[in-house]
Each structure stands twice: as structure tokens, then as C-alpha cells.
Amino acid sequence: MTMRLLWILLSLSLLSNSVFADVVIEGFKMPESVIEDKDGNIYVSEIGERDVDKDGKITMIDKSGNLTTIVDDLYDPKGLVLFDNKLYVTDRDVVVEVDIENKTSSVYAGTMQFPRSPVFLNDIDVDDKGNLYVSDSGDFKSTGQIFIIKTSGEIETIFEDERNLIKAPNGLLLDGDALYVLDWAGEFFEADLNKKSFKKIAEGFNGGDGIAKVKDTFFLSSWLEGKLYKLIAGKAELINDKFEAAADISLSQDNKKVYIPDMKAGTLTILDVI
């Protein structure tokens, strides 16, 4: 048994026993996103080496600490979301569907299906019907856009009228009829999907990446600054500034822990938030 596996087993044991402890799991290659399923399995997207094609993969950590590669033929996998026992992953300019049980992947939404060619597909979320919302960070300056991939296969650009506000959308979070957007430029927006309204609710998160939410509390990560924030009623509080590149965060199923992939450090940190 490797030292890495022993450390993961110890970490998961601490978590399962509700011991207040921050856990750091090492050994990933540019981890970008993370998500936990209802059974407690944790999935991590790993971009792999820079400028190397087809070395990206999805790794699963089960409750016993065993690591399994689900698929390993991706380019630069980033955002992850689970729906109907499948993983949906942004991978450069396509969205990939991953069959976890069979360990296979296929293109769910190809480049040519988008109304405008995507440049840098980044985060992804899903509604209760299976429609996917995907951010395209573009050139990280002013060409970003947000897509909806409907279950019918139709893809639309949404919030076209707000493109002067949306510079480089990164993190996405659906909460009922609200879509929250964290822009790379550091601004945090709330969009009403029914009223088609769009408003800024906070700013100052330079290199904004991931979003998580527990009741009225948001957790926001800054990739550029290596920071994790807590946001309540528009007021931000710094939780941790020790990361090298805090990427796409998520919550545990019980909403008591936040998972933070650190892309540059190659780690997954698990912090108690309750």
C-alpha cells in the first residue's frame, strides 16, 4: 500500500468520524474540479501536463481511499457535474459525457453544435431536468459567454444582452431559478433565469473560479490569488489564503465540508465549514 493511499485512508477516516480536521490529499496533476456523489465517492478532473494532449483524466476516490481512473483520454478536463449516474465534463471546446460504471467517455456536445465556437469551456452545472449550463471564459478578457445545452441537444447562448458585463465567466452555480456566475475579472453575479435579469452582487475576487453555497452563505475561490472566501449578504470574509491556485470548489453531500483543488500544488484540500 502506497503512502499516498495510507494518507487518503487516514483522511477519509477522520472525515467519516466528524473530526474537525483540514485534510490535504496530494499527488494530482493539475486538478481543476471536484464533485462528490451521493455514495461518498469523490471525482477529480486532472488536466495533466501542460501542452500535452490526451493525458487528462477523471480520478475517483472511494470511501475506502482507493483511487480509480475512470477515463484517461481527455484533453484538459475542467468543470464536473453529476446527473443520472453520469459525469459531464468540459474539455476545451466540447462537453464530454462519462459513463462511470463502464468507464467510457463520449462527446455529448461537440464544437460545431454551439451557436458560436467556444474558446475555453470552463465550468458546468445542471438543472433538475438535465439541461446543462456551461461557461466559456473566452480569451479571459472580454469574449466570454454562457451556454445552455438542452436535453433535446439544442444549444443556446444565454444573457446575450449582458455581454458587456460578462467578461470571462468562470464559476457557475444553479440554485432554483437563480444562476450565479463568478467572473475571472473578479465580479460575482446573480441571474434570474425566469425574469432574464442580471445583477452584480459582489466584486473583488480577482481570478474568480469556483462557487459553492450553503443556505445564504457562498464560498468563492480565487485562482489567481490562491484564496477562499466566504460571502454573506454581500460581505466577503477571507477563509484561507494559502493556496497556490484555488480552482473549482464544491461541497460535500452533507454541506459540512468544502473541497478545493489546488491546480498548481497538485492537491485536494478538504476544509470543515460547519
Language-model segments: which ranges?
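A short beta-strand motif characteristic of beta-propeller blades
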Residues: D22-I25, G65-V71, T104-P115, E154-E162, ...
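Bacterial N-terminal signal peptides
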Residues: W7-S16
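Short glycine/acidic-enriched loop and turn motifs that connect beta-strands
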Residues: G48-V52, V94-V95, G138-S142, G186-E187, ...
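Short loop/turn segments that connect beta-strands within beta-propeller blades
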Residues: I61-G65, D99-K103, I149-E154, D192-K196, ...
